[in-house]
Every structure is written in structure tokens, then in C-alpha cells.
Regions:
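Extracytoplasmic/secreted envelope proteins and their assembly/folding machinery
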Residues: 44-47, 51, 73, 99, ...
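Active-site histidine-acidic residue metal-binding/catalytic motifs
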Residues: 2-73
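A short, glycine/acidic-enriched catalytic loop
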Residues: 22-39, 91-124
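Soluble non-cytosolic domains of exported or imported proteins
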Residues: 37-45, 70, 107-112, 167-175
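Active-site-adjacent mobile loop/cap segments within catalytic or ligand-binding domains
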Residues: 13-16, 27, 35, 84-93, ...
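Catalytic cores of processing enzymes, dominated by hydrolases/peptidases
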Residues: 9, 73, 83, 105-159
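Solvent-exposed loop/turn segments at secondary-structure junctions
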Residues: 22-24, 67-70, 89-95, 107-109, ...
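A short, hydrophobic beta-strand-centered structural micro-motif
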Residues: 73-89
Length: 192
């Protein structure tokens, strides 16, 4: 088997799994049993769990989390990925529910991957389907989706601010983890 210029075997897809937010800007949150749980806490936990479990031959999985406001677009582009999955959780009014996936408005491959990811996430979570959402660079999540080289999606599996029970949260994270593994299996076996 031949290697690409970046040392990865030809035919292998490099997938970047990005934990959304950082220590400075931790994203949305919920309070469970007096403990504040942030979006960044959960996204870093989620990508680490997936990295431990993922063993697909055709996938070179890179996990990324940030601790500052450096230029994320340049950082992602320097990783020479084929696919970017940016992991987030939603928030609104502590009542909203559902799953949605964002993609760059000009990317037909991003739209296809978003549609596949949305179907898989809603199947695993059983939450209302809020659909896939095209984004422009100035929109929420738009910069990472529109200015990076890989085919990119941003997943919002559920509304974190609507979760009040630790057991439900743990089960939901497990379901999201299983869904992302299924998305990676799709990426491994299919072209976009």
C-alpha cells in the first residue's frame, strides 16, 4: 500500500473530531445536582470516548480540543483532514428539544454528510428532527464550516440546557457516541 504525502495510507480517510468550545468560552451549560456541566466538558469527554472505541481500518481519526482562541481554521487546515466533525450541544430556553446538524451552505458533500449524520443521530437519540441547516461564514458555526478545507459538519445532538438528570445525560452521551461511531463507519465505507 502506498502512502500519501502526509504519511497516511492511500485510501485511508483522515477524520478530525473536534471538541467544540474551550476553557475560556465553555459554551452552554446545565446544572445537575449542584454541579455545573459545560458544553466543553461534554465535548472533550465525548471525543475522548470515541477515540478510545473507534477501530475502523480505513479511518485515521484525529481528536482536537482547544484551550485558547488561536486560529482554529488554520489549525484544522494544517491537519490535512478529509472530514471534520465539530461536536457541540445546543441551548435555548431550557425547554427546546431536538437534533440538528449544520454544514457549509456551498458544500454539496457537506450537505450529504449532514443529512446522513442527522438521520443517524435522530435514530439513536429519538429526539425531534430539527433538520440540517446550511450556514454562511458569518452564521453560528459558520467560520469552521465554510473556511476549512475538509468536508465539515457541526453536530448539535441535543439541548444541554434542557437536561437535569445525571443518568439521562450519561445515557444521552452514550447514544451520541454510538451515533458518531456509526457516522464514522459510513464515512469509512462510502464516498461523499
Amino acid at each position: 500500500m502506498q502512502k500519501r504525502g502526509d504519511g497516511i495510507m492511500v485510501g485511508t480517510k483522515r477524520v478530525i473530531l473536534l471538541a467544540g468550545h474551550n476553557f475560556i468560552s465553555p459554551g452552554c451549560n446545565t446544572n445537575i445536582d449542584g454541579k455545573l456541566i459545560t458544553e466543553f466538558d461534554l465535548t472533550t469527554h465525548l471525543v475522548a470516548e470515541i477515540f478510545k472505541r473507534e477501530r475502523l481500518i480505513g479511518i485515521d481519526l484525529i481528536i482536537k480540543a482547544r484551550n485558547d482562541f488561536g486560529n482554529l481554521v488554520n489549525e484544522v487546515n494544517s491537519l490535512n483532514g478529509d472530514i471534520l466533525i465539530s461536536c457541540h450541544f445546543n441551548a435555548y430556553d431550557r425547554k427546546a428539544q431536538g437534533t440538528e446538524v449544520l454544514y457549509a451552505h456551498t458544500s454539496s458533500k457537506g450537505r450529504k454528510l449532514a443529512s446522513v449524520a442527522q438521520d443517524i443521530l435522530t435514530k439513536h437519540l429519538g429526539l425531534p428532527d430539527r433538520g440540517i441547516k446550511p450556514t454562511k461564514p458569518e452564521d453560528r458555526g459558520g467560520s469552521i464550516l465554510n473556511k476549512t478545507k475538509p468536508v465539515a459538519i457541526l453536530i448539535e445532538p441535543f439541548f444541554l440546557d434542557n437536561i437535569k438528570n445525571k443518568d439521562y445525560l450519561e445515557k444521552s452521551i452514550e447514544k451520541v457516541s454510538n451515533a458518531i461511531i456509526e457516522i464514522l463507519e459510513y464515512v469509512d465505507k462510502n464516498e461523499l
